[in-house]
Amino acid sequence: MDTIALGISATKLISLLGSKRAPLLLDVRRAAAFDADSVVIASATWRDPFAVDDWLKFLPHHREIVVYCVHGHEISKNTCSALRTSGSGRLISHFLEGGIEAWKAAGGPTIKKGAAPGIPSAVNNPSKWITRERPKIDRIACPWMIRRFIDPMAEFIYAPSDQVLVRAQQQSAIPYDVPGVQFSHRGDRCSFDALIEDFQINDPALDALALIVRGADTGKPQLAAQSAGLLAISLGLSALYADDHQMLDEGMNVYDALYAWIKTARAEVHNADFFKQP
């Protein structure tokens, strides 16, 4: 196994964020540096750089990993090398060039630590989230954002409406998109907006997606041209899949595609000029 620590730029990593192509991000700053900062890179979880053997076995199989420290110096490089020499043969790992400071300078999104219990998640203890069964829009959009920006290992539970709060307490799960909880509708805004607000995620593409979600979820398709289409696709997925988790799996692709379109393809047009005769 190659023992050389390989770097990835903040710009490259930003381009991967918000999709299934994104690597697993591990914050390996020294504990004092981690505790002194109020944010982590979006989707990152903290792991002790001096106890790699304690958490290595809990990493998911066959997923690329990026580790970062403050400036991309010895802490992240040493951790990266340790992962690459783990003997598993499956840990393709890189370190973030310039660390979290380079990420912030490049405008990469971060999330506020402690905006919800158990975030960032601990070793072998992913956050759990619970909401009403038979999701349509917000209850698919929120899990997408949680997996892509907050906790990539998060687990989701769908329950009958009258059981959500009881089961949330029983299973130490975070309730969302139900009345009277932290992550729910606020005025004319939906639960997706509440997550962005409370985790203080500063990402223009995510803000644009939030407008589309809000229009589809609150019956205001005039908010964004894509809202009506998202509503149609969401209702179609609900009609196709009786299993809520299967619908979530399919819905993740929808939001990956919408987010990618916002980031990279909004200016692209499609017409029939190719078929017109000269």
What is each stretch, according to the model?
Residues 157:
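Segments forming glycine/polar-rich beta-alpha architectures that bind adenosine-containing cofactors
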Residues 162-164:
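Intrinsically disordered cytosolic tails
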Residues 241-244:
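Terminal low-complexity "docking" segments
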Residues 1-24, 28-66, 71-143, 148-153, ...:
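Rhodanese-like catalytic fold shared by cysteine-dependent sulfurtransferases
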Residues 186-190:
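C-terminal catalytic/acceptor-binding lobe
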